[in-house]
Amino acid sequence: MVAVVKGERLMRPADRAGAWTGFDMTIPQEKIAELLDREAIRDCIYRYCRGVDRADEVSLRGAYWPDATDQHGPYSGPVEGFFQWAHGIFESGARNVHMVGNILIEFTALKEAVVETYFLALQRGPGRDDSLRQFLIAGRYCDVFQQRDGEWRVFRRVVVYDWVEEQVAATQSEEPRFGPRLPLGARFPDDSIYDLLGRR
């Protein structure tokens, strides 16, 4: 009996003469290349999340091509302007926590892909009147990724918002609220991940 999985022939144990040594599977090189491309795109999305959560501008810039555009809430335009807008948020001392879930990658050309990434974000920082505000946001990064010189980055991003909920922000400082739960997350270069990476 032969099992067919997306065009690949997998021999079951009963089809083999002699001892069972595992599946006989040949994966075309183009399939392996596609898997590597998908993983590179996911890494880029994770790099973006580190960039915004750790106020790490090197990681953030590394997620976009220099000529990219971003439609991102109140900002829409060239990605350089988005970086400046994000820098202002970083300087305000805002706390960001981004988590990504479903990532659907659809290749539309040899070196281009449309990528839909679901996200949840907790954003806490000063409002216009300097009062502390906190939001839970759910949405999707709807991206066009391009591969250049073997690297995948965002070329066009549209952030779609599916849910926004303002929460009551705790007024107590983080140290007593977190108690013994240390170390606290921090900005670049003070977060613990940079110790492990040797990037201090």
Residue ranges and their predicted role:
Residues 98-100, 136-141:
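Short, surface-exposed coil-to-beta transition loops
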Residues 57-125:
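A solvent-exposed, acidic/Ser-Thr-rich amphipathic alpha-helical stretch
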Residues 167-200:
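Acidic/histidine-enriched, glycine/proline-rich intrinsically disordered or flexible terminal extensions
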Residues 127-135, 171-172:
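Short, surface-exposed loop/helix-turn segments at secondary-structure junctions
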Residues 12-50, 54, 58-63:
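Short, low-complexity N-terminal intrinsically disordered segments enriched in polar/charged residues
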Residues 1-11:
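Extreme N-terminal basic, low-complexity initiation segments
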Residues 12, 20-22, 114, 138-171:
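Short beta-strand edge/turn micro-motifs at domain boundaries
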Residues 122-131, 164-165:
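Short, cysteine-centered beta-strand-loop-beta hairpins and adjacent loop/turn segments enriched
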